[in-house]
């Protein structure tokens, strides 16, 4: 069985992430499967691009290609630049502050080779806390810092994966184009600021509908994602949750189908929050009151902000026909 070549794309925009990138590159070079190509797309910082090149040369990493995005800034634009340079049959995306398990590439290549109905793969994104005291955060809200809340032990078909750990066959881009450049972070998402996200969700929806193939969550394709303390601040959570609600309302309208409940993933998560998270947090009130109160507070904050974002899009669409946001 011939295994495919994998092009792995990561993007970054600031020297503050240089150490993270070097650690990511080291984890990529430690992969058990060697038929990989690594493409790093830097933007907004020529110094960053130069430092990454120097690091790859110093460490003798010949499979590392460093590009500089001189066009429109943003995660989607940078990824699209990388896609244009990729030579692999599989094109994968990881965040610059992620670390891959040593068998990540091997498991990815094998999964594609064994099942031609799979057009995309994703897998567990495990939080690597800056401080262990942050681990009180409920799993149901791991999506706030781009980690997965799924705890499945067997492969399962999903609507989409997270950009911290996602890949597609080349045919997905040949048939469906690239990421929409008006979606996705424009500055790393540090503040959770005013920006439409959901670029992986939107692309995944297009790919599944046009190829009629599956996107699969595979429990053995694992990465760790660094979670810095700022991501648990009220300000970050509030903005991140608002825009999550806004973009999901947009997708629910624009990709509505009688054959598929586009927001079924969110509906299942909401049910889990009310049936599992809230009761378990209430049980902790007497034994671990600090943890219980933090969990209940973040639950209220997230639900309120997601609802506000959802209603904001819904109301604005009545007057401004917001489907124009998806074009680009």
Set out the residue ranges of the language-model regions.
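Non-catalytic, C-terminal membrane-associated alpha-helical segments of glycosyltransferases
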Residues: 240-243, 257-328
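Conserved donor NDP-sugar-binding/catalytic core segment of glycosyltransferases
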Residues: 103-137
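N-proximal low-complexity "stem/linker" segments adjacent to membrane-targeting elements
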Residues: 1-29
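Glycine-rich, basic loop-to-helix element that forms the pyrophosphate-binding segment
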Residues: 69-86
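A short, conserved alpha-helix in the catalytic core of glycosyltransferases
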Residues: 165-168, 172-177, 183-221
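Acidic donor-binding segment of Leloir-type glycosyltransferases
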Residues: 25-68
């Amino acid at each position: 069985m011939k295994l495919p070549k994998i092009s792995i794309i990561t993007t970054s925009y600031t020297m503050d992430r240089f150490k993270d990138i070097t650690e990511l590159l080291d984890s990529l070079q430690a992969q058990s499967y060697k038929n990989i190509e690594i493409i790093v797309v830097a933007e907004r910082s020529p110094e960053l691009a130069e430092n990454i090149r120097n690091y790859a040369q110093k460490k003798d990493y010949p499979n590392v290609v460093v590009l500089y995005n001189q066009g429109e800034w943003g995660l989607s634009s940078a990824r699209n630049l990388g896609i244009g340079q990729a030579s692999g049959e599989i094109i994968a995306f990881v965040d610059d502050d992620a670390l891959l398990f040593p068998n990540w590439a091997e498991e990815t290549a094998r999964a594609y080779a064994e099942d031609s109905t799979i057009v995309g793969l994703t897998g567990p994104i495990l939080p690597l806390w800056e401080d262990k005291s942050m681990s009180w955060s409920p799993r149901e809200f791991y999506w706030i810092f781009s980690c997965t809340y799924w705890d499945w032990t067997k492969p399962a078909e999903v609507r989409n994966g997270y950009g911290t750990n996602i890949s597609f066959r080349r045919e997905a881009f040949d048939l469906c184009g690239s990421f929409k450049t008006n979606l996705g972070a424009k500055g790393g998402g540090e503040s959770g600021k005013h920006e439409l996200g959901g670029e992986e969700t939107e692309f995944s929806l297009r790919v599944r509908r046009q190829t009629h193939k599956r996107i699969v969550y595979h429990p053995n394709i694992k990465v760790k994602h660094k979670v810095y303390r700022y991501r648990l601040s009220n300000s970050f959570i509030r903005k991140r949750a608002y825009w999550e609600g806004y973009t999901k309302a947009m997708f629910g309208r624009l990709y509505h189908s009688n054959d598929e409940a586009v927001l079924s993933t969110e509906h299942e998560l909401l049910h889990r929050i009310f049936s599992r998270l809230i009761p378990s947090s209430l049980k902790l009130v007497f034994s671990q009151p600090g943890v219980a109160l933090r969990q209940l507070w973040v639950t209220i904050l997230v639900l309120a902000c997601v609802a506000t974002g959802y209603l904001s899009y819904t109301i604005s669409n009545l007057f401004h026909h917001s489907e124009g946001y998806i074009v680009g």
